[in-house]
């Protein structure tokens, strides 16, 4: 299921807010020298369908480049149909995952029921970046470690408080930090990213109010397409579909541990 080119372009522009890039007719390659171990700030996107031989050549070249950079991983994304049998011919084993692209049906907006008493604030200072770190640690400290979560948050926080275009929002209820979410808008397309509700507040309706608030902002900014990307193995996609998101495409992510 191919992804609309305008959405792919929005994905690239989003990553450019964090990473330097190199581009040719086949690929676009991103590098974030401030966070070299962040998989989705440092990846290569294969832009078009190609033969098995061409694809293998590009994958091998990208792995070789990452090895020369002394990196411990190589992350390659592609939205064309992917034949997994190709992987048996490559020296390194890939962890293959499928990510789905889901677009919000704006006609569902009025049906989104939101809890009262919540405040959604745009991140515009370092103190609020610390609130995002609080959320990140609730979610990811166990799996990713405090050091990485802290470095990731402050790296991304630099962009949130800048004018680069990626905005982050924090949800509060009675002074408690409930969750956070990012919003990026480009040429009428809005990308929702890093949506998270702290574990103790999940399945209580807070997620819907966060999403509704960001969708409302996007609509008021004249976005005609509002989308998010989620792992197809993640149960969250069922919630997204229930509230008005429809699948419009998917991509394969090939992650090589080097």
Give, region by region, the residue ranges found by the protein language model.
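Conserved active-site alpha-helix within GNAT-family acetyltransferase domains
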Residues: 82-96, 208, 232-250
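N-terminal charged segments
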Residues: 1-69, 81-82
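Conserved acetyl-CoA-binding loop-helix of GNAT-fold acetyltransferases
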Residues: 55-62, 194-197, 203-218, 242
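A short helix-loop-beta-strand connector motif used in the catalytic cores of GNAT acetyltransferases and
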Residues: 14-22, 70-72, 98, 158-169, ...
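Acyl-donor-binding surface of acyltransferase catalytic domains
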Residues: 54-127, 254-256
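A conserved beta-strand-loop-helix scaffold within acyl/acetyltransferase catalytic domains
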Residues: 149-196
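Conserved GNAT acetyl-CoA-binding A-motif
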Residues: 69-79, 218-230
């Amino acid at each position: 299921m191919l992804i609309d080119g305008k959405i792919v372009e929005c994905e690239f522009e989003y990553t450019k807010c964090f990473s330097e890039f190199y581009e040719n007719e086949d690929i676009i390659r991103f590098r974030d020298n401030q966070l070299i171990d962040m998989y989705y700030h440092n990846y290569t996107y294969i832009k078009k369908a190609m033969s098995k031989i061409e694809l293998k050549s590009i994958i091998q070249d990208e792995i070789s480049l990452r090895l020369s950079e002394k990196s411990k991983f190589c992350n390659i994304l592609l939205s064309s149909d992917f034949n997994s049998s190709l992987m048996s011919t490559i020296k390194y084993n890939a962890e293959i995952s499928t990510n789905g692209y889901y677009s919000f049906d704006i006609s569902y907006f009025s049906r989104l029921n939101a809890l009262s008493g919540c405040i959604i604030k745009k991140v515009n200072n370092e103190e609020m970046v610390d609130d995002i770190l609080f959320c990140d640690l609730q979610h990811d400290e166990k799996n990713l470690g405090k050091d990485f979560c802290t470095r990731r948050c402050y790296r991304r926080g630099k962009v949130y408080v800048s004018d680069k275009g990626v905005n982050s929002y924090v949800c509060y209820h009675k002074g408690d930090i409930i969750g956070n979410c990012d919003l990026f808008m480009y040429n009428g397309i809005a990308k929702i990213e890093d949506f998270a509700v702290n574990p103790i507040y999940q399945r209580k309706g807070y997620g819907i109010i966060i999403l509704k608030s960001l969708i409302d902002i996007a609509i008021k900014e004249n976005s005609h397409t509002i989308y998010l990307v989620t792992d197809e193995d993640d149960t969250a996609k069922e919630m997204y579909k229930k509230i008005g998101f429809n699948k419009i495409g998917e991509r394969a992510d090939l992650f090589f541990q080097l």
